[in-house]
Amino acid sequence: MSRRPNFGGMGMGNMQGLIKQAKKMQQQMEAEQANLATQEFVGKSADDMVVATFSGDRQLKDLKIDKEAIDPDDPDMLQDLVIDAVNKGIKAVDDATQASMGKYTKGLM
C-alpha cells in the first residue's frame, strides 16, 4: 500500500489554496509597486536651496538648485545641500515603500 506524503495535515486542496493566495498576493504587490512608481517624492535641503524629486522607483527626476546656493568660493556647501536633498528624497521613497509594501513583507524577514 503506498502512502501519500504528509504535508503537516494539509491536503492538496489546502496546498492549491495557498498557491492561489500567494499568486494573488504577488499581483497585489506588483500593483502597489506600479502605483509607487507613478508617484513623486521630494527631498529638500535647508532653506529649500536644493530640491530633489524622485519617482517611486527611486529614479532622480529633477534637481533644482537655487542660485543663492552657488558660491564659487564654497563648493562644499553646494555639495552638502545636494547630498542632503537627495538623501531626504530617497528616504521619502523608502518610507512610502515600507508603508505600502510592509503589509506583505511583515514576518518574512
UniProtKB/Swiss-Prot annotation:
GO cellular component: bacterial nucleoid; cytosol
InterPro entries with a match to the protein in the record: YbaB-like_sf, YbaB/EbfC
Keyword Isomerase carried by entry: no
UniProt main location, coarse: cytoplasm
Subcellular location: Cytoplasm, Nucleoid
Gene3D superfamilies: Nucleoid-associated protein YbaB-like domain
UniProt-recorded Gene Ontology molecular function terms: DNA binding
Entry keyword annotation includes DNA-binding: yes
Superkingdom field: Bacteria
Its biological purpose: Binds to DNA and alters its conformation. May be involved in regulation of gene expression, nucleoid organization and DNA protection.
Family listed: Belongs to the YbaB/EbfC family.
Protein name according to UniProt: Nucleoid-associated protein LGAS_0369
Source organism of the structure: Lactobacillus gasseri (strain ATCC 33323 / DSM 20243 / BCRC 14619 / CIP 102991 / JCM 1131 / KCTC 3163 / NCIMB 11718 / NCTC 13722 / AM63)
